[in-house]
């Protein structure tokens, strides 16, 4: 069985040196209190599967949190650019590729209760169901 999509995205970000690793500074469907600087990935409602296509359209929000707005924005922009491809195809791992649709550039999402700033963006990923 394949890895979950969010884990494959984290592994890809690790391979391009934008995160240290899953559960270190990148978290899936979980927001830890510490460390201050983290990358957060969450999958939300995508589009329904169609009977004639083996691919499904999934939606992912990627957020970067930091004590410094410039740092959060810069890392969010680096991740955004790492997911950009002229063909829209990104090879997350040797077992998973996806057609990535960048829905908007990074924007300021919120300031949390500890005055840390979050920048984020949303992507659509056409990939396998697993």
Give each language-model segment a name.
Residues 38, 59-61, 118-122:
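Broad gene-expression machinery/nucleic-acid interaction feature
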Residues 1-52, 74, 86-95:
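Small/polar-rich, solvent-exposed N-terminal microdomains that initiate assembly or binding
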Residues 66-89:
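Mid-chain, well-packed structural core segment of small domains
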Residues 27, 42, 63, 124-126:
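Residues in well-ordered beta-strands of folded domains
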Residues 53-66:
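Short glycine-rich, basic-tinged beta-strand/loop micro-motifs
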Residues 1-12, 44-55, 95-130:
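Short, charged interaction patches at domain edges and termini
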């Amino acid at each position: 069985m394949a890895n979950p999509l969010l884990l494959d995205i984290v592994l890809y970000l690790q391979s391009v040196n934008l995160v240290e690793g899953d559960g270190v500074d990148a978290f899936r469907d979980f927001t830890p209190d510490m460390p201050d600087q983290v990358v957060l990935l969450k999958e939300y409602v995508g589009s329904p599967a169609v009977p004639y296509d083996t691919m499904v359209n999934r939606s992912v929000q990627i957020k970067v949190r930091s004590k410094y707005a410039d740092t959060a924005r810069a890392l969010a922009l680096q991740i955004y650019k790492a997911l950009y491809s002229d063909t829209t195809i990104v090879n997350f791992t040797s077992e998973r590729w996806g057609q990535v649709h960048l829905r908007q550039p990074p924007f300021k999402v919120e300031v949390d209760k500890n005055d840390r700033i979050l920048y984020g963006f949303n992507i659509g990923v056409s990939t396998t169901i697993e």
